[in-house]
Amino acid sequence: MIYHFTEEYDIIVIGAGHAGVEASLAASRMGCKVLLATINIEMLAFMPCNPSIGGSAKGIVVREVDALGGEMAKTIDKTYIQMKMLNTGKGPAVRALRAQADKELYSKEMRKTVENQENLTLRQTMIDEILVEDGKAVGVRTATHQEYAAKAVIVTTGTALRGEIIIGDLKYSSGPNHSLASINLADNLKELGLEIGRFKTGTPPRVKASSINYDVTEIQPGDEVPNHFSYTSRDEDYVKDQVPCWLTYTNGTSHEIIQNNLHRAPMFTGVVKGVGPRYCPSIEDKIVRFADKERHQLFLEPEGRNTEEVYVQGLSTSLPEDVQRDLVHSIKGLENAEMMRTGYAIEYDMVLPHQLRATLETKKISGLFTAGQTNGTSGYEEAAGQGIIAGINAALKIQGKPELILKRSDGYIGVMIDDLVTKGTIEPYRLLTSRAEYRLILRHDNADMRLTEMGREIGLVDDERWARFEIKKNQFDNEMKRLDSIKLKPVKETNAKVEEMGFKPLTDAVTAKEFLRRPEVSYQDVVAFIGPAAEELDDKIIELIETEIKYEGYISKAMDQVAKMKRMEEKRIPANIDWDDIDSIATEARQKFKLINPETIGQASRISGVNPADISILMVYLEGKNRSISKTLQKSK
């Protein structure tokens, strides 16, 4: 095939949503010449659904992206209207930060970053085809018949792939927020031999702020204590003048309106055929599935400081517009609310993720990567996490460097990608803390400790950032050593002070670290006995120290499990293995192995339907093959 390339790039990224911007920024910062192509520049890093970043598990992903050298955390720290730490009354493993975003400002701020990034070209164009030669991605062709060469292509098209919006009996071709759908590229991905699925998501109506009666709703303010997503943000820049959200509920009348109109609901008439998200169902789905519930929470979330639009969180729907209006007016506080936008469902094509490697490169086509909702996930944060990994690995591949694979013990990003490529997904995938078996070591407070060194090694963490990280790490290490070296003895004077503070007296000598391990004792209590650290420690380091010490036993057990799994991950499976050549493994295991083609024993062990006996047989088979190869090599010598 002869192509007429008018421009040449190292990497072309298709789609400028949250996955696309992270992929393109990472690759360009690693020295690659990158083209970021988008159908509509005005929608760069746009939030077509909820105007927020973070939340349970998701907030930790944002910090992981930041630790690796990504941009989402920095951008939301510049553009939030409210910041809140969730689950503060629970254990450290499930705490996470959530921000209400000024969605227009967020998009503009990210666009400014992209436009000012060296090596990165932003262009509004529609990509119709990925050009492939000898099993390798070599470029793209646009709708205007321009051909651009590339050594790698990353598809981050979100819900635009053959997107269709559904409102009642109305169904039309569209991407998110009534943008153009990408039809030809969807066809092209099928023609390239990729297996394609069909998913669905939705969004609620938006109402006018000045038409809401806030007096009958419950105010939900942000936090006064400074918190940030990015480890580079400063407490003195924390926004105190925050915009509150408001809580209201559906009621019996709301439910009756929905029940009376189920015959007009696309979810139940067969119009919607795509699989929807389990953890973010439409309101009509909730009313049917949870018929015993008298009410459902709804959060009224402002979409920015300079807009009247308010997002009705929890009211996602594709009901006809007239039904949506009646439904909105049945809700306390929204009796006279003006609906500014109608809720809708959107169906879209996605690439079944079992076809991907852990680098997010497709197994079928070398140099073709996919990330974000294209891979079947939901959420801006999940998209950003995949985007930065795809961008990093595309850059490493064309630079001839070792790939970056995040393990399940490295971060929630690693958990997500492993789930996708090992188990696949039959519905839009959402990250949850319950998906992570090592969640006590994958906390919001230690993402930088886990991943900054990786970001530095690949070139995404600059000298200034690295110097700040080293200072923090040294302060943490030094204080942990100090606490372990100082002894508190059960002498009269010490115990008098211990009892005065309301604690049980000491019966044996203990280190300051052991004393801090007591649930009721805080770091400041310990300092009252041993004095402050040589260098003043900020609250974030103190939080990290307390968590590491108080949960040391559990963390140690988790690390033992990590070491065991690491040994299994180090046992590679040859890419050309003949699964039919292995005797005695169960039929289901053989079928799953053929479908997923696991790269390591560890990955093989996590495939659903594969039992320990199958893994044992596989390991015996591989050991036999290795012995056979060794004997052959010895004979040839």
Swiss-Prot record:
Q: Which cofactor does it need?
A: FAD
| GO MF annotation terms | flavin adenine dinucleotide binding
Q: Which InterPro entries match?
A: FAD/NAD-bd_sf (IPR036188), GIDA_C_N (IPR049312), MnmG (IPR004416), MnmG-rel (IPR002218), MnmG-rel_CS (IPR020595), MnmG_C (IPR026904), MnmG_C_subdom (IPR047001), MnmG_C_subdom_sf (IPR044920)
Q: Which UniProt keywords apply?
A: Cytoplasm, FAD, Flavoprotein, NAD, tRNA processing
List the Pfam families.
GIDA, GIDA_C_1st, SAM_GIDA_C
Any GO BP annotation: tRNA methylation
Residues binding NAD(+), per UniProt: 276-290
Tell me the SMART domains matching this sequence: GIDA_assoc_3 (SM01228)
A GO cellular component term found in this entry reads: cytosol
Main location as per UniProt = cytoplasm
Instruction: Provide the binding site for FAD.
Output: G15, A16, G17, H18, A19, G20, I127, S182, Q373
Write out the annotated subcellular location: Cytoplasm
**Family from the record:** Belongs to the MnmG family.
Briefly, what is this protein's role? Answer: NAD-binding protein involved in the addition of a carboxymethylaminomethyl (cmnm) group at the wobble position (U34) of certain tRNAs, forming tRNA-cmnm(5)s(2)U34.
Subunit field text: Homodimer. Heterotetramer of two MnmE and two MnmG subunits.
Q: What is this protein called?
A: tRNA uridine 5-carboxymethylaminomethyl modification enzyme MnmG
Origin organism is Streptococcus pneumoniae serotype 2 (strain D39 / NCTC 7466)
Gene name of this polypeptide:
mnmG
